[in-house]
Amino acid sequence: MNPDLRRERAAATFNPELITHLLDGSPEKTRRRREIENKILSDPDFQHENHNFLTRSERYEAAIKKSAVMVKKMREFGIADPDEIMWFKRLLLGNFVEPVGLNYSMFIPTLLNQGTTAQQEKWLHPSTGLQIIGTYAQTEMGHGTHLRGLETTATYDPKTQEFIINSPTVTSIKWWPGGLGKTSNHAIVLAQLITQGKCYGLHAFIVPIREIGTHKPLPGITVGDIGPKFGYEEMDNGYLKMDNYRIPRENMLMKYAQVKPDGTYVKPVSNKLTYGTMVFVRSFLVGAAAQSLSKACTIAIRYSAVRHQSEIKPGEPEPQVLDFQTQQYKLFPILATAYAFQFVGSYMKDTYHRINESIGQGDLSELPELHALTAGLKAFTTWTANAGIEECRLACGGHGYSHCSGIPNIYVTFTPACTFEGENTVMMLQTARFLMKVYDQVQSGKLVHGLVSYLNDLPSQRIQPQQVAVWPTVVDINNPDSLTEIYKLRAARLIDIAAKSLQGEMSHRKSKEVAWNLTSVGLVRATDAHCHYVVVKLFADKLLKIQDKTIQAVLRNLFLLYSLYGISQKAGDFLQGNIMTGSQITQVNQRVLELLAVIRPNAVALVDAFDYKDITLGSVLGRYDGNVYENLFEWAKKSPLNKTEVHESYHKYLKPLQSKL
């Protein structure tokens, strides 16, 4: 054990194990997670080769092999609970992805959400056992987030009771679905449904794309891999072109919308029900943002405690990099954000399951807010985490650029989350549309509920910019309730401004669509403020539920740092709205610096509480034992370029050149 890390852990004011239990949900869940992890670590069937030194084809093959072993072992270990599957995969995959992943994260959930009982009986068992390997083919070359623009068609033929699937243009080719290139034999295809001469919009169809047994593409199907990408080297993101490809009527997922044998269309209760899979994935992306950010943070903070550099006073020993205030200012707000997103991720998961149960019983009342909340928080958390991961890499100095740090792999694996499952700016605008509807409801005298209920205060003059006197003159910057309140005021003010800008443009005889585009920057700002408020509120709510006073105090400091750092970064909003004064902002900035010093003794223990195994981090710099330099040298020796003392290119090109000089 590195002596610096040993000292850091001994100096902590709390037991990290207690926070680990909090993050997992209970001591029993922590015990079970570790039991699963230990089974994997002690199993010789799991060969943990270093993906960094493999070619793309080798990485894909290694990932397929790992997936096959994983399915077999999950059966053997009796792992079926969703949380346990997540723990299993988190350890096994580390910072990489699996080609069969969409079978479990998209294909099966869509089948469960949108398939009839008969359809589930037919396809669910084969897909859980990987006889059917499914993917989710929505995005096309020409359209992604704009679903109404998708061009793939499914035209019903009542004579044969079949749908004819077509990719009518080059831009209609399905493009990007994971596992499509080489792995999947079925896809849930989103296509424009045409029956009795009328288009009824997007619907989901189960489309066989490869022959079971030979795995060859079926006639009428053109399918392949789209080539190298920024990351995701193990994943065969693919393309799919369908030419007059026929599937049985029963292959349309018909839990909500239906097409009768004669071609009659039966519409669903709500069109939003068909977006269930996207809402499901977006709700879980918040947790994924927390996980990726907390991994990067763990690596950067541990390495900053091990690394000694420069001098604070001439002639004195080089201090730990973590002792520099600038390093703390880079990393501790990210640490606080990682914790905030952990709690929001848990809330989103629980909320999704609760509302999904209500939907199953026919109650759709909370669906609009769930749709808006998942869209906005997906964008807010993934953007923030993406920037935070890169900040962690930079905080590791030059070594952060090496794959040995683990952070480049975390970054390139996470960064697509900013554009998949809905491009983030478009997601913010979807939430803004909901906020504008709620704003109009409040203006017409209706009471609204849920996380937007603070907008009920809008009609009172309390949040109008000109009514300065009614704003709180004292903001207690050490009080979670007070901080939550000022984030609420900021959100309400920016929503009010955005709504009035929109109304102003429309009053100039512009159509709502043109007015929307002309005010969209303000609408995104309003959504960002709403999401920021939601995160602050949910973090504050979590503090109240923590029984252990020591743990509550430690996490309260992180809450204060998260909230106050956010105010310092968005000071203009709080000043312009007369929510805070200039002197209060100065106090906030000073308090942020004080909190860095308060959190410093607990920094390593706080990342230890995430309880990541070294294999999950995939980092030489972030090792639990802190023995960085010895392992850095050993890692470099494994580079394939070091297999020979003299590379063959020397004899081919350099030596002949040198001999002629």
From Swiss-Prot:
Entries under InterPro entries matching the protein: ACO, ACOX_C_alpha1, Acyl-CoA_ox_N, Acyl-CoA_Oxase/DH_mid-dom, Acyl-CoA_Oxase/DH_mid-dom_sf, Acyl-CoA_oxidase, Acyl-CoA_oxidase_C, AcylCo_DH-like_C
GO cellular component terms, semicolon-separated: peroxisome
Modified sites of kind Phosphoserine: 26, 649
Pathway: Lipid metabolism; peroxisomal fatty acid beta-oxidation
GO molecular function terms noted in the UniProt entry: acyl-CoA oxidase activity; FAD binding; fatty acid binding; palmitoyl-CoA oxidase activity
Marked site (Cleavage) residue numbers: 468-469
Catalyzed chemical reaction(s): a 2,3-saturated acyl-CoA + O2 = a (2E)-enoyl-CoA + H2O2; hexadecanoyl-CoA + O2 = (2E)-hexadecenoyl-CoA + H2O2; dodecanoyl-CoA + O2 = (2E)-dodecenoyl-CoA + H2O2; octanoyl-CoA + O2 = (2E)-octenoyl-CoA + H2O2
BP GO terms, sorted: fatty acid beta-oxidation using acyl-CoA oxidase; fatty acid oxidation; generation of precursor metabolites and energy; lipid homeostasis; lipid metabolic process; prostaglandin metabolic process; very long-chain fatty acid metabolic process
Leading EC class: oxidoreductase
Residues recorded with modification N6-acetyllysine: 65, 216, 255, 267, 272, 437, 446, 500, 512, 637, 652
Main subcellular localisation: other
Active site positions: 421
Cofactor(s) the protein needs: FAD
Keyword match Disulfide bond: no
Modified residues annotated as N6-succinyllysine in this record: 89, 159, 241, 349, 437, 446, 512, 542, 637, 643, 655
Motif Microbody targeting signal positions after renumbering to this chain: 659-661
Subunit structure: Homodimer. Interacts with LONP2.
Protein name: Peroxisomal acyl-coenzyme A oxidase 1
Species this chain originates from: Cavia porcellus
Lineage start: Eukaryota, Metazoa, Chordata, Craniata, Vertebrata
Gene name as annotated: ACOX1
